[in-house]
Amino acid sequence: MIKYQSTRDSGEVKSAAGAIIQGIAEGKGLFVPCEIPKLPFDVEDMKGKSYKEIAKAVIGAFFDDYSGEEIKSCVDGAYTDKFESEDVVPVVKVGKANILELYHGRTAAFKDMALSILPYLLTAPKIGRASCRERV
C-alpha cells in the first residue's frame, strides 16, 4: 500500500485515506507519497481517453487503499454533469500550443478539478473503516 508522509516530518506517515481525512499534517505540512508508484498503464495509452477515464487510472494508482469500484464511484460522482463541458477539461489548440481549459467548473477556477472529488473520497465506504482503524 502506498504511504503518505508529511512534508515537514517524514516520520508522520498515513495511508491515502488517512491523509485525506486528516488533511493537513500535525506539523502543518502537506501529505505527499513516500514513493511515486509505478503507473500500471503506459502514458501513451491515455491518448484519446476522457478526463474521467484518465482520472480513474491515475487516482487508482496513487490511492490504492480504495477499491476500483470506489474510485469509479468517486470520479463519476465528482465529474458527471457538474462542468459546463462534457469533456470536463477541454483541450483547445492555440497556434502550436494545446491549452487545458480548467475553468468550466462551478466556481470557474482550476480548484474545481481537485475539490470536486474531495467529498466523494471522504465518504467512500472504505474510508469510514480506515478512519476507525487509524483512531484506534
Residue locations for each model-derived region?
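PLP-dependent amino-acid enzyme catalytic core
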Residues: M1-R135
